[in-house]
Regions:
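A structural signal for small-residue-enriched, beta-sheet-centric alpha/beta enzyme cores
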Residues: 2-69, 73, 77-334
Length: 334
């Protein structure tokens, strides 16, 4: 079972999704023109390793990739990792820890998450509290602490959508750090672009912002160096290649919630992870047989909807701070 831990550091932070001691099948799709990533080549379907042990999302721009080192070292102390010589032979285990970062250096003081911060976020993910309902914490937390979304403060958000496949229903949950260069609000109407997806996912109605009040908010991004990153988790037994397709399709949610999206100065990156009884398989076991095409279509649609709603969740629950406007504090449309 995937668990989540955050290290919130005032003006930046780290979020870790821990996939269990045997890991989980995963892949990634990178769409932004300025990504900051680690171990993404490994997750391409044609490469060897099938499973990851954790995924790290971090602030601090490229400096924040150091947080993954702390996660790796912490897991190594628990003898968790890819068995280099196989499960049945003694030898080193290498934790597989992909990561992606956002540019948040314009918020607060220049502060970089460290390996120690990554380890702290992992320890939080390993705690009993991390296995509570995973959609409860959102907004200004973890990797979303220093995020901005257009003219508003961004953050960390989550949303879950059911994929109604022909033979089985599966859950698809998106955990997103919303820090786009583009806007998340329609300046003419004051509505969040992803409001309908959020309302469908949560059952909660959202008020539109007052367009004049929103227009008066200064854009805090003197340099458009940003990024929306996240992880899509499903309980469907997808293969690594299908996880790649799921990550690719999930980017549609960014394109619907952010305008423009996938710009040359964004580093938009989405990981996809199959959370299917990871403890029942060995870390070097072959992947599952996968799902059929109609099921993949349902999973992809649900992933895009979940990503769209999670971005809105991040923005709606962002806390005031650093002189940034927030959805919660701006006047609403009459």
């Amino acid at each position: 079972m995937v668990s989540i831990g955050h290290a919130t550091l005032g003006d930046t932070g780290v979020t870790v999704l821990y996939a269990g001691p045997q890991g989980a099948v995963a892949s990634v799709d990178v769409r932004g023109g300025g990504p900051g990533t680690r171990e993404t080549d490994l997750l391409e379907p044609h490469n060897t390793v099938e499973r990851v042990h954790a995924i790290v999302l971090s602030g601090g721009s490229a400096f924040g990739l150091a947080a993954a080192d702390g996660v790796m070292r912490e897991l190594a102390t628990h003898d968790i990792g890819f068995p280099v010589f196989g499960e049945d032979r003694p030898g080193p285990r290498v934790p597989i820890i992909p990561a992606a970062v956002i540019f948040d250096l314009i918020v607060g003081e220049v502060h970089y998450p460290t390996a120690s911060d990554g380890a702290a976020a992992l320890r939080a993910a390993l705690s009993d509290a991390a296995f509570a309902p995973l959609l409860e914490v959102s907004g200004t937390v973890g990797a979303g602490t220093g995020a901005t979304a257009g003219r508003l403060r961004g953050g960390f958000g989550a949303a879950s959508v059911t994929a109604h496949a022909p033979s089985h229903d599966y859950q698809v949950t998106a955990y997103m750090v919303a820090n786009p260069a583009g806007e998340v609000v329609d300046a003419e109407t004051g509505e969040l672009f992803g409001a309908r997806a959020y309302e469908r996912a949560t059952g909660e109605s959202l008020e539109a912002l007052d367009p004049e009040a929103y227009a008066a908010v200064p854009d805090p991004k003197h340099a458009k160096l940003n990024t929306t990153i996240g992880v899509v988790v499903t309980d469907a037994p997808v293969t690594k290649a299908q996880a790649k397709r799921l990550a690719l399709t999930a980017h549609d949610g960014i394109a619907r919630a952010v305008r423009p999206a996938h710009s040359p100065l964004d580093g938009d990156t989405i990981f996809a992870l199959s959370d299917v009884s990871a403890g029942a398989a060995s870390a070097d076991a072959p992947a599952a047989a996968g799902v059929d095409t109609p099921t993949m279509m349902a999973l992809g649609a649900a992933a895009a909807d979940a990503v769209e709603a999670a971005i809105v969740d991040a923005v709606v629950h962002a806390a005031p701070g650093f002189g940034l406007a927030t959805y919660a504090t701006l006047p609403k449309r009459a």
